[in-house]
Amino acid sequence: MSADRVRLPDLIDRLPADERDITTRLATAFLDAGHELFLVGGIVRDLLLDRGRTDLDFTTSAVPEETKAASVAARPDSVYLVGEEYGTVGLVFRVDPEALPITVEVTTFRSEVYPTEDRRPVVTHGVSLVDDLSRRDFTINALALDPLAGELVDPFNGITDLAHRRIVAVGDAGERFNEDPLRVLRAARFASQLGFDIDPDTLDAMRETGPQLARISRERIAAELNRLLVGDR
């Protein structure tokens, strides 16, 4: 096991039973088809913090057509393409007829390059899991869980930052915020929602990037501010 993988075999048990069953079915189906599949992002962060339910998001080595084919064995009720450019496939599971269906998203490993300031990245599929995690905003969101092996993949020390209750940008903070200035508000939102502090270098980059929020649409800013205002501090 590499240094950035940690054995946490019981972490998946924190999922509600229906979501745990879906996760196991999907992971088994993808493994049988020869693909990697990981829970990724906010769901992993919130499982580690033992917080409430977060949407199930997966990342995979499979491209969308392979994802749709592999998912058949997991018996979803419907499959749809969320965004072809980003390699995302949505799966709907109607587990309980008395409850809302459970919708999950499965996205192909990808890297992103932002050649201009219009926020439209050039997306490359077929990269590694670590490459995929490296494009994410903060270390606490750059975490992936192998549901079957019970291994947490943590190449950017997100577990340490969770333990120290701090928001730290992945890699170069200035680059992360320049890629998408809305991340300035996202950092503030996570600090508010989780009661975390913001790492000094990350905070400096936020101050430098703040004026660039002027190029973000009012709708996106308003949506992020609404999420920020419901935080605890």
Q: Would you name each region that the model predicts?
A:
Residues 1-233:
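Catalytic cores of the polymerase beta-like nucleotidyltransferase superfamily
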